[in-house]
């Protein structure tokens, strides 16, 4: 016990600022959870020096950060609480390009009414940082989430303290702010670097993509083979610009300065300037900014002739970051940055006791007797021993965050980092060298870039190899939390996910819906879709099918017809064989097993002849789930509805899913009486008008005892199937719920 107390006292002496870090965290969380805040305040007081002045500083810091958090959150929350949009006029001062959505810029809008708003400006790539504009435009807030686990632009803006979005209608330039000159310089330099690091790599798309991502943060699409390889090898911290890259840039600068007659303190300042410049050039991404701040706090001790302390430097950077913006403590990247560095600081010494055995030398052997090559080999072993220890504790530190937020576990990343971090260092160094040489000697610059391209390809193949190692990574499948999710694309399209078998989709929505909404939802769930059924070749229903297929998990697709005019539909069919997806044209009466006691039945085949529009070629399907029947009608029209009534079709159903026919006539009361359905889920959109269910149609259905789930009001609809009951729930309206019983 006395040993533990002594360690505690030593930690307080070595890292007195740790108490202030916990105090600032307490203040940032006060509005979210009082109990967590009080617990952290108690820990801060325990870690503080036994001095009433120090403890008073802790309490004051908690109060100040809590007040600042409340001011920021209340202002942003009040602004986003305003529904709809409004036209405004005023003076707009533009900020930097957004790190994720590069066509957008932050800005400060001073409206003619006297109000001031921090805004995100849409389609602002043509403007410059610090540009002052007289504008007329539309202020708006992002729409509410209509589907479970959908990416929230509203939360993204809140985390950046953005109050509203701004679409500019008319703009007139009034000049530039001189204070923003460094940002403009960084943006121009980034454009030059993009050209410089890619010169001579026009025919090497893999090498070019890897270099652009590692050096400038210009990542390829998330579903590309390159991104998947680095993600599944646990090496995204190497692939995307992060704090690691800022650190490596500082290390490269220091290696150059070691060969020059530069005093140590001056060298440290130059290293910090290099890190700050790199962070700005890459868009001041939060991980890069945090790493630069941490490095400044740590290396600043050398400039001030003080003994550096890792924990003290981390604590100081944490306090400064939280005071600047308390809301960022809720961001995943912020938690990862400090969590990993805390783990490294606490555990790297322990880990090195094991990895350091690789670099051990007999303690009785004089090192001065080693020749040059033996000394170099020893230095290499020590480097990899230290890197291995760091990789182990970094992975352990990131493990809970990655599992909780992303549902992926990548133990192979420990080994992957040993190979990829040295390669990344070389790629960064050659990229800067190639860009510099290209200014004076273009041919030599291109030669350097081609060499770099070969190394970048090696990095990709290395990551791909580690990603292929059995049990090197696995996804903790969290699922949708419900049996059937009827998504709301809000554009008149349709998409459903059935959590059965290897995962089943019935329609996938438009390409836009899949790319910007559905893909991220499925990835968050850890869902691997192995089977797909398509109702008809309408772009709003099948537009994302070829993108889903490119994920590589799709093994079977049931389609209405082999021929259609839809380009996305044709792309899907033509690429199926290359992606290992078996195409089956739905056959009337045939049952397709989905998994367990769930199967799909084709009621009516899709029509092969072209009848003008895709809505006239519907394949009518029915899903049987534990004895419950769900009839899928797609955008069935009046003509086909009458044909089904006149034909010998079994249309019995408990629930019906339907859309709106292009000509506006979809499903009437006689048809519904034949089915015996008790609930109808209808897709909807405000535009075009025919996609919106008529109010008189809804009233007629409800008067006849049919529960309508109008997705304009409900958003997504969730269904859970039991042996004796079937529950339907609206995502947007928690109070709207229906339970069907046998």
Sequence positions of predicted segments:
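Core dinuclear metal-dependent hydrolase active-site scaffold
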Residues: 219, 322-330, 463-531, 577-652, ...
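Active-site metal-binding motif and surrounding structural segment of the metallo-beta-lactamase
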Residues: 501-504, 512-564, 646-664, 676-681
């Amino acid at each position: 016990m006395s040993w533990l107390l002594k360690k505690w006292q030593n930690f307080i002496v070595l890292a007195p600022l740790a108490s202030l870090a916990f105090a600032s965290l307490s203040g940032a969380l006060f509005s979210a959870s009082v109990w967590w805040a009080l617990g952290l305040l108690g820990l801060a007081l325990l870690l503080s020096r036994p001095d009433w002045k120090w403890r008073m500083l802790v309490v004051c810091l908690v109060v100040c950060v809590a007040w600042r958090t409340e001011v920021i959150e209340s202002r942003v929350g009040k602004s986003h609480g305003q529904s709809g949009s409004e036209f405004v006029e005023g003076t707009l001062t533009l900020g930097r390009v957004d790190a994720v959505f590069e066509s957008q810029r932050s800005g400060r809008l001073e409206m003619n009414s006297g109000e001031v708003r921090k805004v995100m400006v849409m389609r602002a790539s043509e403007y410059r940082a610090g540009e002052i504009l007289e504008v007329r435009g539309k202020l708006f807030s992002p729409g509410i989430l209509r589907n479970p686990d959908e990416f929230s632009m509203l939360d993204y803006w809140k985390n950046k303290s953005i109050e509203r979005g701004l679409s500019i209608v008319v703009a007139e330039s009034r000049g530039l702010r001189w204070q923003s000159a460094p940002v403009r310089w960084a943006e121009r330099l980034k454009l030059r670097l993009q050209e410089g690091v890619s010169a001579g790599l026009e025919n090497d798309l893999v090498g070019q993509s890897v270099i652009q991502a590692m050096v400038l943060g210009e990542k390829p699409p998330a579903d590309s083979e390159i991104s998947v390889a680095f993600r599944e090898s646990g090496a995204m911290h190497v692939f995307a610009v992060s704090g690691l890259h800022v650190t490596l840039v500082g290390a490269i600068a220091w290696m150059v300065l070691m060969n020059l007659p530069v005093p140590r303190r001056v060298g440290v300042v130059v290293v910090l300037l290099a890190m700050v410049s790199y962070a700005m050039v890459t868009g001041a991404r939060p991980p890069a900014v945090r790493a630069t701040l941490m490095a400044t706090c740590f290396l600043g001790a050398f400039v001030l002739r003080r003994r550096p302390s890792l924990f003290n430097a981390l604590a100081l950077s944490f306090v400064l970051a939280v005071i600047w913006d308390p809301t960022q403590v809720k961001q995943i990247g912020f938690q990862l940055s400090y969590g990993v560095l805390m783990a490294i600081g606490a555990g790297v010494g322990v880990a090195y006791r094991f990895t350091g055995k690789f670099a051990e030398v007999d303690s009785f052997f004089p090192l001065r007797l080693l020749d040059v090559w033996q000394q170099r080999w020893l230095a290499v072993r020590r480097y990899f021993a230290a890197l291995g220890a760091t990789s182990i504790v970094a992975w352990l530190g990131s493990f809970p965050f990655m599992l909780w937020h992303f549902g992926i576990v990548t133990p192979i990343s420990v080994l992957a980092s040993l190979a990829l971090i040295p390669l990344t260092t070389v790629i960064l160094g050659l990229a800067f060298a190639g860009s510099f040489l290209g200014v004076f000697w273009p041919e030599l610059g291109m030669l350097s870039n081609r060499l770099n391209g070969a190394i970048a390809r090696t990095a990709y193949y290395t990551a791909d190899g580690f990603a292929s190692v059995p049990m090197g990574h696995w996804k903790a499948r969290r699922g949708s939390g419900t049996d059937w999710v009827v998504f709301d694309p809000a554009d008149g399209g349709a998409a459903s996910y059935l959590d059965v078998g290897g995962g089943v989709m019935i329609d996938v929505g438009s390409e836009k819906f899949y790319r910007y909404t559905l893909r991220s939802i499925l990835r968050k769930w850890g869902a691997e879709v192995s089977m797909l059924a398509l109702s008809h070749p309408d772009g709003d229903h099948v537009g994302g099918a070829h993108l889903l297929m490119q994920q590589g998990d799709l093994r079977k697709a049931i389609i209405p017809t082999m021929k259609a005019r839809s380009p996305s539909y044709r792309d899907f069919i033509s690429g199926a064989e290359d992606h290992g997806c078996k195409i089956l044209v739905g056959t009337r009466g045939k049952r397709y097993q989905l998994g367990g006691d769930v199967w799909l039945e084709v009621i009516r085949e899709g029509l092969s002849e072209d009848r003008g529009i895709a809505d006239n070629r519907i394949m009518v399907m029915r899903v049987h789930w534990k004895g419950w029947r769900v009839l899928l009608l797609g955008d069935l029209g009046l003509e086909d509805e009458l044909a089904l009534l006149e034909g010998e079709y079994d249309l019995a159903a408990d629930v019906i899913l339907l859309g709106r026919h292009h000509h506006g006539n979809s499903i009437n009361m006689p048809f519904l009486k034949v089915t015996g359905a008790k609930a109808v889920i209808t897709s909807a959109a405000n535009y075009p008008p025919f996609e919106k269910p008529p109010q008189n149609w809804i009233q007629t259905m409800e008067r006849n005892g049919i529960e309508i789930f109008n997705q304009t009001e409900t958003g997504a609809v969730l269904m859970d199937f039991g042996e004796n009951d079937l529950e339907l729930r609206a995502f947007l309206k928690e109070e709207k719920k229906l339970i069907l019983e046998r």
